[in-house]
Each structure stands twice: as C-alpha cells, then as structure tokens.
Amino acid sequence: MGRAKIKKKSMFIDMTAMSDVTVLLLTFFMLTSTFVKKEPVEVFTPASVSEIKIPETNILQILVDPAGKIFMSLDKQPDMKAVLEKMGEEYGVKFTPEQEQKFIVASTFGVPMKSMPKFLDLPTEKQDRILKNEGIPCDSTDNQFKSWVRNARAVNSDLRIAIKADANTPYAVIKKVMNSLQDLRENRYNLITSLKTTSEK
C-alpha cells in the first residue's frame, strides 16, 4: 500500500510592515544627518579633552592645512553671495552671474581675488585639483584673509568663527591667523579638535 503524499504548501510572508519600517528608518537618517562639507585638503586635528559642540549654523570655518595654506567656508549660500559681492567691490573684481552661482554652491573657497574669476570658470574637477595648491593670502603686504573675515562679519553679525588646523601645521601660521582676527577685534573663536581617547589622557 502506497504512502499518502502530503501536499507542500507555499509559505507567504507579508513584507509590507518590514518595507514600511525600512522607508521610515531611511527617511529618519536622511532628515537628521548633517551634510559633511568637502574640504580641499585632508586635515588631522589635534586631540583635546574639550567636549564643547560647535554650532551647525552661522559658522565661518577657517581651515589651515599642514603646509600653512588657508581656506574658508560659510554655511549659508546667501552669505556666500553677499560676501563675494563685497570682496569684488573692495578689490575691483567683477563676477558674472554664472561665476557667482559656482561660488555660492562651493563648499570651501581659498584662492587670491585676482585669480577668482578664472578659477570659477573652470570645471569642478579642475577646481578641486587647483584649490589644494592655492590658499587665501594672509601676509603683511596682502592680507586678503582679514578682508574675507571683515566682510563676512558685515554680512552676518551672528557668525561664529571656528579654526580647524592640522596637528602638524606650524604654530607661526596659526599665530598669524589669530593675530589677523585680533586686528579685527575678533577675539572669540573656537578651535576644532578631535576628542582624546582614555589611553591618550
């Protein structure tokens, strides 16, 4: 006598709830994550025990690479546009609407004013390659760094200044940046550092 065959039943799992959770999580991370700006150079900040959080808005960030080149960034596009216009007036440099648009969407800037129009005409990939070898002048004969800070403050009085320098940046360069800020009576600023681990303390 043959054995009765048991019919195989197909399993059906309703994945609707799982897909809903996935979409919710994805939306949550997209809305709560902060945009990390692309920087022209890689900077390894020195370690410290300070846990003060830098504000995410109204920030003027000053980036100093190991070679002492200075770059800057503003977090608001209207501020970027207004500051560029003021710098153009101060240095007698005119910008086309296309050049202005390229500037305000850039995450970081750092070329001398006389080179700025030609720089902004370049494709983004070429700009990235050139920018890391430039830097904002900050010497006694041509301190454009001070002009950028002064005009940024004129555009947005609520700006917070943050300096992000590499651990191997020469102290003389940082001192020059700080002296320039003091000349403008900008005596309040944050130094961006990485948090020391327990083994480093």
Please annotate each region the language model reported.
Residues 2-3, 66:
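GHKL (Bergerat-fold) ATPase N-terminal catalytic module, capturing the glycine-rich phosphate-binding loop
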Residues 36-201:
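Long, low-hydrophobicity, acidic/polar, solvent-exposed interaction domains
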Residues 3-40:
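Hydrophobic single transmembrane helices highlighted by the model
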